[in-house]
Amino acid sequence: MKTFHKIILPVSLGALGLIIFNSYSVRIPRGATAVKNFDTKKYLGRWYEIARFDYRFEKNMDNVTAEYSENPDGTIQVKNKGYDYLKKVWNESIGEAQFVKDPTEARLKVSFFKPIWAGYNVIDIDEDYQYALVAGRSLKYLWILSRITNIPESIRQRFLEKARKIGYDTSELIWVRHNQ
């Protein structure tokens, strides 16, 4: 019986820690609001990464795309692809996204390494679903996406202004090259 208690306590604490970590990871930055009346079907498809912060998982990457498609169970498949210009190789990661609550609110969680989830929050999008501003769980995570390899200056300024108002340091953004 004592052995059982020695095992169950650490396992329970570990499970509790994982639950707390996962709930923290899918947050949205203070001051940011996810898009309401979100249309998942219009969001699916290919997006080009226009700008991001310097993340270790995207280090030295250009020509970055994200492709979203619906899985049979209603979750969303996420396929990220980018070219490592130092190693001269293409890298691809496949993950899954799920809505945090209501699928008409653009608050999702994404995982490339289950059971670890990260916040994925569409905080601005044009009415035609051609350009999107995506926030992660904190002010360290931000992406500007487009259906084409560039973005109109008016949309760029709109997204940068919104990000600055939330508290993002937009001077740290990396503007992704698309040449392949």
Placement of each model-derived feature along the sequence:
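A beta-rich soluble binding module of mature secreted/lumenal proteins
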Residues: 2-180
